[in-house]
């Protein structure tokens, strides 16, 4: 994929940040010394961590240089590092690994989650939030359009960028043998959106990227036009003219055994 667009992402920063706030609220570690914001993006979640734990040694990690530039501008006193979560290893065992809306882009969750738990210091916490929306109309329509003849050749592998999440039970079974506490919950947000275009713009900054980036301009515009029409049919107007955009998310907080 092409690099992320911080300006587009920031148009919906309050909606993107809300799950991070709710995830952090369930982290009970009293005083983590070393914290890693894994997949920190533009630093919105890093800022929450800094405000909650101002005495901690905090580092933000992401693979997008554009997002990291935005994060450094937001929090010039925090070190931000460009790295890939898939092969990242800490130099010091963290007391808290915070991964808000990042691990869904990394393959092989069985191995990934076990590795992250092993990276933690004894008693450390792994806090994860992941979109669980591949079966929502927003993402079903991406795949349906990608299978049509106009875009099939260019988008043959677009859907491979993200695999479906494991079941809640599978995540629990992965984490429980290494943890003294596992907290898992699922939330389906209903974001009140002013228009169809607002929904599409939100998705352009996230889930649509693997489907738009491979396309030349003419095909990209045609895909977006067809997608926007179908989104309007899937997310109909409510009584006040707004549209409810359903967005399920999975939350996990696991504390490594001391």
From Swiss-Prot:
UniProt cross-references to CDD domains, sorted A to Z: AdoMet_MTases
Family: Belongs to the methyltransferase superfamily. Tam family.
Function: Catalyzes the S-adenosylmethionine monomethyl esterification of trans-aconitate.
SUPFAM superfamilies per UniProt: S-adenosyl-L-methionine-dependent methyltransferases
Gene: tam
Cellular compartments per GO CC: cytoplasm
Keywords: Cytoplasm, Methyltransferase, S-adenosyl-L-methionine, Transferase
Enzyme class: transferase
Subcellular location: Cytoplasm
The protein, known as: Trans-aconitate 2-methyltransferase
